[in-house]
Amino acid sequence: MGSNDLINEAYDDSEVVGEERESKSAWMKRWYQLLTSPLDLQLVINEKLEMINWDAYAKSLAKPLGNFLTILFFIIRLLQDNLIKPNYYKLNVKSGAFDLSKSNKLKEFDYLWEISSSFQNSNQFYAFQSWYFVTLRFLNNLFRFTIFILLSLNLYVSCKFMFGYFKTYNLFHLKKEFNSPNLTKHNLKDLSKEYYEDIYKQSLWSMLKHFFRGSRDDGPHVNQNEVEIFFQLRKWIPTNFMINLFVSFSPTAIVFLSFSDVSFTSAIAIVFHQYILDYIITKRFQRSVDDDLILSSAALQEYEDKHIMARINQCSNIDTLSSAMGTRSKTPRIFTTHSLCGEEIREVYNYEKREFEALPKMTESVPGSRETRIKDYGGISQVSDNQSHPIGFHYSPRMSPYYRDKVLDNNLAQSSSNENLEKGGAFLPNQDQNRPSKSLSPLRKTPLSARQKRFEGSEFNVLNKNDINSILRSPKKKKNYHKR
């Protein structure tokens, strides 16, 4: 064996020793962390428990476990009332109550000592000397301990079921205050509060009160007419696993067995009680909650199909695209509902009042179909009073009364455009005088001099003449005064 082999063996032994030392030090560190910070272990265990889907084991684990605990409690109470209770006196008698061998007076007299010794040797019926009563005494202690564990477990399950599953919802769009003890009104400023910093500044009693009672302390009074408010709903939502465990390991059955003389006929009442409770809660009430969820989902899907999807489909997106004649003016979103009599009701949401307002039947502005709008863009749409104007052309709000009053004169001027050409009136620039254009409005076909005369006698003569001329001469008037 060479020197290199010896060096390699020594090197290998050092690695093994180092690994053993590292493993020992790692175990020492783990034990030290476990002893110094046991809350870390509790945190790890809670994380593992929370990651388990307990609702999947509601039927396979919770219900059989609860029934087993109830049957175990029934058997223990049955043995206590029929086996331990008749021998209660013999089990609780003191072993040294009639021990004559411990009497100093009897030891002074020899004949009395002989009588007492012969009496004790002939009577071996004391409970402490019999193996039967020793076994019963052991069973009595075991039954008491088991009853205490089962009562504590049932109390924990009941409290966890009734007070341990609450979720808080902030309702910002609820307007009507319902008569529910779980619904409270709060101010919007409460959302920006730093609760724990405010609590730490208070007294020790306030801190203990908060951590034991949670955030259920009564807050400041909120004005009923205040606008910046929201409702907070604290809803009780137990899990399916806990519901089945509570029903199968019911506190009513445990209380009944604890305060009554249990016999074999009591099993009939327990079986009937378990069946009725399971039928009412799991097969009726819980399924009713699931049916309400189905109805809510169906109503939400119907609203989405009729109101939401109808407004974001492909045709609606095409209608909102800009065209050469400009986009149409937007109308407020109209929601269609029906009354109890079957009448159609159209409502629009008022953002200032924050409520829906019903639209009159004669003044509803429902946008037309796409084909109708395309036809209107190509020509002149007819309006009431036998007036016409090009669709897509929007006047200025200040000038609209004047054009509305003079629209009849413009129609007459449109019919006699050839006569205006013979009069030698000035026309707008970029206008083909030989062939009238389709896109020209009736006002642009009227001579400039005639329009200026109408302005001088109207209520708009206070305007600057340069502004009026620029408005009338501008070829991009439609673009500048297009209502967006």
From Swiss-Prot:
Membrane topology summary: Multi-pass membrane protein
Residue ranges with Polar residues bias: 430-440
Ranges annotated as spanning the membrane: 145-165, 252-272
Signal peptide positions on this chain: none
Role this protein plays: Member of a perinuclear network that controls recombination at multiple loci to maintain genome stability. Required for rDNA repeat stability.
Family as reported in the entry's similarity comment: Belongs to the NUR1 family.
Subcellular location per the Swiss-Prot or TrEMBL entry: Nucleus membrane
UniProt name for this protein: Nuclear rim protein 1
Keywords on record: Membrane, Nucleus, Phosphoprotein, Transmembrane, Transmembrane helix
GO cellular component, one term: nuclear membrane
Organism: Saccharomyces cerevisiae (strain YJM789) (Baker's yeast)
Subunit structure: Interacts with CSM1.
Modified residues (Phosphoserine): 3, 417, 474
GO biological process: maintenance of rDNA; regulation of exit from mitosis
Lineage: Eukaryota, Fungi, Dikarya, Ascomycota, Saccharomycotina
Region of interest called Disordered, as start-end residue ranges on this chain: 416-458
Domain of life: Eukaryota
